[in-house]
A protein has these predicted regions:
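Extracellular LysM carbohydrate-binding repeats and other cell-envelope/extracellular binding modules
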Residues: 3-46
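Intrinsically disordered, low-complexity Ser/Thr-rich linker and spacer segments
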Residues: 36-65
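Peptidoglycan cell-wall recognition and remodeling modules
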Residues: 12, 16-26, 57-196
Length: 196
């Protein structure tokens, strides 16, 4: 559905919301009719976030531990600066999201969910474990990596920047982040936690 959304200048989240009958957004069956009028246009056209410049291969992801200082507010602001995005709406949403995902710990690793499988990496944990302050899996981190950020998944600025690019692509969050809490429940302090 992402290609259809882009072709019709509609956010993916809006297209999915307008088509609850579609059970697998990666597979549209012949004869299946989509509702294109129920969606809302993605601000600025079909691309709702930065270009994919910066994506890296899975083999380029590194697994060092973060030893610097800072907090989620500062890291999110830096991610916004790197991506040339206004931080006003992103910071509050990511304070909530990161508190729920990792308690704000840039070295957090989830070894107990369904992603925790694959070959052991240099940090001693399976490849697909969620890692870092925004709990990115390496697949998501590498495909949404932002140029000019670290390739280390534990670097909080790089982790948050990749997560921001992911939510813009996956959920259609606008580049100014004004709709982050609406489209990503995990970033909304007024709704219960929900994975993203």
């Amino acid at each position: 559905m992402s290609g259809i959304a882009a072709a019709h200048n509609i956010s993916l989240a809006a297209l999915e919301a307008a088509n609850p009958q579609v059970t697998n957004p990666d597979l549209i069956n012949p004869g299946e009719v989509l509702n294109l009028t129920g969606g809302t246009r993605a601000p600025g056209g079909p691309q709702t976030g930065p270009s994919p410049k910066g994506a890296i291969s899975m083999g380029a992801v590194t697994y060092g531990r973060y030893t610097g200082g800072g907090d989620v507010s500062a890291w999110t602001t830096r991610a916004c600066e790197t991506m040339d995005l206004p931080p006003a709406h992103w910071v509050g949403g990511y304070i909530t999201l990161c508190a729920r995902e990792s308690s704000g710990n840039p070295n957090a690793i989830n070894t107990s969910d369904s992603n925790a499988h694959g070959p052991i990496q240099s940090d001693g944990h399976p490849l697909h474990c969620s890692r870092g302050v925004a709990q990115c899996i390496p697949d998501t981190f590498s495909s949404n990596h932002v140029a000019e950020t670290s390739t280390d998944i534990y670097d909080p600025v790089a982790n948050i920047a990749a997560s921001m690019r992911y939510v813009m692509r996956r959920y259609g969050v606008s580049s100014d982040g004004h709709d982050l809490a609406v489209l990503v429940q995990q970033a909304d302090p007024n709704r219960p936690p929900h994975g993203y």
